[in-house]
Amino acid sequence: AGDGGTGTSSPITISSLTNGTAYTARVYAINAYGTSSASDASSSFTPSLPRAYFLGGTDGSNKTNAISYINMSTTGMDSIDFGDLAANQGNTTGCSSSTRGLVGSGLFWTGSTNSTVNTIQYITMTTSGSGQDFGDLTVARYEAGSFSNETRGVWFGGYAGGASNVIDYVTIASTGNASDFGNLLAANFSIQGTSGTTRGLMAGGYTNTRVNVIQYVTIASTADSTDFGDLSSVRSGVAGASSNTRALFANGFS
């Protein structure tokens, strides 16, 4: 229901709403003569705080199936349980639209054995729950990279008995197996990506040695990657972040 809000002019801020829940609002006036009748209900609105999600992972040889999140507009909070992946999964990578999160590739932990997987799972951002089956990547691998825009999720590179040069993609709003997008400049794993709405960048990684190459694709197309430039040093396992204007690559193994 929320705690409502007061004010002498528009807009009026309403507090204590639940993220992802639809609401309507009514307004009434209070003055020296009393309280008016409530207005008609407003159009439905759904508050949505920006969240960051964490899916699976590994600590040495121990894999986890945990999904958790934090609200990015707050500080000093621990992550909150969201649900579980289908199995303990590490060395995986994910991407998202504003409404869905996808996780694909990686290593499943089954007893004392790791198995490389091609599965893709998804969650609906505003509803806590476990990962649901989406489809399969074209190649089972781990230590792949990924990025997305609002429409497509893209995975590239990785390790599958050797480095892979495969780029494949899915339409995030649907479900189904990934389709071939093209190839990297060279087979590469421990590579990372980031993207704007139009371009996806892929940087660093390990071919037969660590590399400093940055390459790109146009996300709405299907084609092999194109050389973009170089990182300031050769390294694998970098972290990537971007806006629509600028991309940053940090850390990594040199």
Residues covered by each model-derived region:
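Kelch-like beta-propeller repeat domains
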Residues: N31-Y33, S43-S254
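Recognizes extended acidic, P/S/T-rich segments that occur
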Residues: A1-G20, A32-Y33, A38
